[in-house]
C-alpha cells in the first residue's frame, strides 16, 4: 500500500513543481526556489530524519503543544508512535527531500522546448494554461513516460534508510516492508539467513523486471512511447 501511494503522489509532484516554476515564476525567483528545494536532497536521511523526529516528538512537537493549549486538541497526539501517521510522515518527508532533485530532469526538458512555440502561441492569444497544456506537457511527454516506466518498475524499492529512521516498535505494523524485512532477516537475525534473503531479493528483482516490461508495453499501446 505504501509503495503504490508513494508512486501516486511522489511521481506527479516533481512534474507539477517543474512546470509551475518554469511557467509561473520569474527567472530570478525561479533560481532561488530551485536552490532551496534542491538543498535537502544532499542531507543524509539520518540528519534530515532527525530534524523531523525532533519536530514531531511527543514532548517537543510545537504544533502539537500549540493546538493542545488552544483547546483544539483534547490531548497531545503521539505522531511518531501512532501507526496511522507513519505513511503520511514517509510521503511528506520524501517529497520535501526529493521533489527539487526529482524535478531537475523535467526542468531541463522544459528548457529545451523551442521558445518560438511559446511566442507563436502568444500571438495566437494563448494564455499560460493553454501553453502548458498544448506545448509544455506534450513536449516533455517522452520524459514523463520514461520516468513513469522506471518508477513503476522500482515500486518495490522504498528506501530502507528512510524507513529505518522513522521506524519504531509502535508503528511497526505500518512501517515493515519488504526492504526492511530483508535487511533485518539477513543481518540482524541470529542465524544470518543470507541464502533466504538473497532468494527474496532475487524474486523482488524478477517482479521489478516484469513490471518494467508490462509498464513499457502499456505505455507504448496508450501513448506510442516507451523505453524500447
Predicted regions and their residues:
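A structural signal for multi-pass alpha-helical bundles of membrane permease subunits
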Residues: 1-228
Amino acid at each position: 500500500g505504501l509503495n503504490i501511494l508513494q508512486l501516486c503522489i511522489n511521481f506527479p509532484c516533481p512534474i507539477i513543481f517543474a512546470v509551475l516554476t518554469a511557467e509561473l515564476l520569474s527567472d530570478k525567483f525561479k533560481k532561488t526556489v530551485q536552490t532551496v528545494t534542491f538543498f535537502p536532497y544532499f542531507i543524509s536521511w539520518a540528519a534530515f530524519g532527525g530534524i523531523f523526529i525532533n519536530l514531531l516528538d511527543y514532548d517537543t512537537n510545537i504544533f502539537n503543544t500549540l493546538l493542545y493549549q488552544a483547546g483544539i486538541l483534547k490531548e497531545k497526539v503521539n505522531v511518531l508512535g501512532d501507526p496511522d501517521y507513519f505513511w503520511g510522515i514517509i510521503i511528506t518527508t520524501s517529497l520535501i527531500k526529493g521533489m527539487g532533485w526529482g524535478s531537475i530532469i523535467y526542468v531541463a526538458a522544459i528548457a529545451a522546448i523551442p521558445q518560438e512555440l511559446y511566442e507563436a502561441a502568444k500571438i495566437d492569444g494563448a494564455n499560460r494554461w493553454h501553453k502548458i497544456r498544448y506545448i509544455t506537457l506534450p513536449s516533455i511527454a517522452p520524459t514523463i513516460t520514461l520516468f513513469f516506466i522506471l518508477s513503476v518498475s522500482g515500486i518495490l524499492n522504498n528506501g530502507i534508510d528512510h524507513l529505518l529512521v522513522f521506524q519504531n516498535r509502535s508503528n511497526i505494523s505500518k512501517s515493515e516492508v519488504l526492504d526492511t524485512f530483508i535487511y533485518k532477516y539477513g543481518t540482524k537475525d541470529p542465524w544470518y539467513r543470507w541464502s533466504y534473503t538473497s532468494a527474496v531479493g532475487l524474486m523482488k528483482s524478477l517482479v521489478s523486471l516484469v513490471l518494467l516490461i508490462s509498464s513499457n508495453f502499456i505505455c507504448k499501446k496508450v501513448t506510442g512511447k516507451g523505453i524500447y
